[in-house]
Structure formats: structure tokens, C-alpha cells
């Protein structure tokens, strides 16, 4: 017994020594990691590097960021201020909040900073995209892509978008059980991007498979760039390869069949616009371009659509006021009239309260956290040096949350954007859901168009209620969305705003 007791004590002592050694090793390595990045400061500049933590060697604070969500940024902003350093997704990063700070970054494109997304996003989106291009190449690509989102192009997309949304809402209302709004909004925006924006005639079964693959792709766009089996980065690369094959097949089939079209879709415009600028696009450029267009129309719009539905659920008075505006304009048509072409761009533009609702959703629930830049030359920001070679992320969501121009910043209040109040009129960099400067989101008008049509159709054709006891928590990666997807039961409404019986709803859905 004595020897057994001594052996146990010896084992515990060995374990304790190992734990102490590991703890000391972690502490020393973490300290060396902090010093390694502190040494990169520009010694010709007397200003200090921003305060903050670089986390653990190699992984930095990526784990904290993924687990804490919005709390990561807010806790560090409270501790270190509006400009702080961290290490995310395999690289050192300075995060920036506040209108004046963001203004300097956005207006400093090509002089102080240049765009550079995290490595995972650069690889997965591809080298031929607008997002990954810089300088003259970026300017030329924007000219080519801008025609896709012109007023004329949006007017041609509108009837098709309205029909896709009407079709989807009837399908939601015909379901006997609640639906997962975020997941179904992803299906809706993916269908809109593929069918309407790109004009692909992909069979329904193949479209469903592509959607599943695309979800895997989007979920890993922002991942630790470590190419190992079963890593998120590897899954993203595999998804990209499958998507590229599917897109090439769809593009080739589309180029061979130009008969029977009643409008020019984005791919038609993209090919024609590139020819006008003296360049014939290669197949790889077309594949990267279509992948980027789907990405732009899919993830962020699905996020905003889900946020819109959640806020209309939380604020029935807002929904009723929206219905009153539609009723006054003769647009409260009900689900019994699946008519194409009842909306026009000028009609949507005249709906002032609708515009306020969409703006407020985008203020409080901006789908993306911000934008990434690489520092071209050391400059000063908020009393700190931003060293050449470092990465900077300007924070859209936190700039909205801390903007002094907005009263009761955490309250959902569409009237803050009314003509009487116009809280966003003082300083354009307090409100920037679509970024700013030379890299303002090209598809912002399409996104707003989609959200407005969705709001009109929701108010006109649907009653909806939360299927859970409480509203879900929100997570931010890869874009803002409810952790459970938001479970909601939908019911169809007729032209008199009376609920449509399930049998009638099923008949309407079957005719689409």
C-alpha cells in the first residue's frame, strides 16, 4: 500500500510538472508572438501601434472571434478604443470603427490602402473577380460590371424577381409546418441569382445540388487558410471546383441557346459590356465573374431578407404602417393575384416608408462586418500609426452602433430616416451598409430592389408568426444570421387580407 501511494504521488507530481511546463511554454510563446508583431512598427514614425492582443501563435484570436461573435468587437473596442490590433484568419489586423476613421480608409484607396481580402476569400472567390482586383484592373472591371446594375437592367429584372418571390411565398404558406427562414431565404436568393440574374436554365434537381455545394462554399469563404484534410479551407476549395464545373456547363449551354428570351440578363450584359471595352472574356473569367455575382446576390441578401422578416415579426406596428402605404398606392394586391409586372422601379421609389424600413434593417443588421484593406504606406489614425504592410478592417456594423447621429441606436425605428428627421443627413460615413469610396458595393441597388419587392409581397400576401417561444440569438459568421435560422409559420392572404385556406393555397402553388 505504501508503494502504491508513493507511485500515485509520483504520477501526480509528474502530471503537475507537465502542466506547469506546458503553461510556461504557452505563456512564453504567446509573449514572443506579441513581441514579434510589436517589432513590425514603423520606426520612422513616433506614434505607437494600436493597443490590443495578437492572441496565440499562428491562430491569433480567430477562436475568440468565432465563439464570441459581436461580443468580440464590442469587448475589445471598450477595452482598447475605436482602433485596436488583433490577429484573425492567419494574419495581423487593425480593426477600425468610427465615421472619421472609416472615411480616411475609404477615401485613401490606391494611396494609403489597397484592397486585400483574407487569403481564404481571395483563393475561393478567384483571381478574376472585381473584389480581388486593384488599380486600373479594378477600375476597368467596375466599368464592365456596372452595366449589370444600371437602371435599365434593374427594370428588366424586376418582373422576374417579383414572380420568383411570389412563387416562393406561396410555397412557404402551403407548408403545414414552420420553415427555417434563413435557409429558405438562401434558396430564394440563390434561385434569383441563377435563374433571373444569370438566366441559366438548370434542371431543378441539378439546381438543388448546386445550392448544397454553394452553401459549403460560402460557409468556408472566411476560414483559417490551412489546406489540410477535413479543414474548412479544403472543403471550400472542393466546393469551388464542383461549382466551376457546373457553371462552365451552364455557361456553354446558355451561349449556344439564345432563342426565346424576353430580356437581357446579367451574363448577356457582362459579355456585351466587355466587348464594348475591347476585351473578350475567357471562360475562366466568365466562371469567376458568375461565381462572384452569385456570391454578391446570395449570402448578404439572404441575411438581410431574414433580418427584414424578423423585424416585421417583432414590430407589427411597422408592418401595419407599411400595409397602409401600400394600400394608399393600390399595391395591397393579396396572394390570389400572382400577376407579373405590377411593380415598376419608379413605383418602388415613391414608397417612402418602405425605403425607411429597408434602410433601418440595413443599419441595425448589416450583413457583413466590414471591408479589408492592406496598408500601402504608414499613416496616422486616431493617434496611432498604421504600419505599412499590415491589414486593416473598417467596421461597418460597429460604426453604425456608435454613430452619434442616430438617436436610441439600438432601437428599430424606420422613421429615423423620414424626411422630418433624416438622422443620416449629417456625414455620409456614419451610415455605410454598402461600403463607400471607389469600392462601394456594385450590387447595392439590386439588393435594395430585392428587399423592397420582398417587403411588398410579404405585406400583401402573407401573415406570419414566430414558431418558437423566443427570438433566436444572432451570429455574425460568415454573414449575420439567426443561430437557428428563424423558425416561422406562414399563412397566405387574399386580396381582402383574409387568410387563404390551406386547400386553396395548395391549388395556387400547384399552378405556378
From Swiss-Prot:
Gene3D superfamilies (alphabetical): Cytochrome P450
CDD domains in UniProt: CYP26B1 (cd20637)
EC number(s) from the headed UniProt entry: 1.14.13.-
Recorded topology in the membrane: Peripheral membrane protein
Amino-acid positions noted as binding heme in the UniProt annotation, renumbered to this chain: 441
Record's subcellular location: Endoplasmic reticulum membrane; Microsome membrane
One annotated Gene Ontology cellular component of this protein: endoplasmic reticulum membrane
A single GO molecular function term of this UniProt record: retinoic acid binding
Function: A cytochrome P450 monooxygenase involved in the metabolism of retinoates (RAs), the active metabolites of vitamin A, and critical signaling molecules in animals. RAs exist as at least four different isomers: all-trans-RA (atRA), 9-cis-RA, 13-cis-RA, and 9,13-dicis-RA, where atRA is considered to be the biologically active isomer, although 9-cis-RA and 13-cis-RA also have activity.
The protein's name: Cytochrome P450 26B1
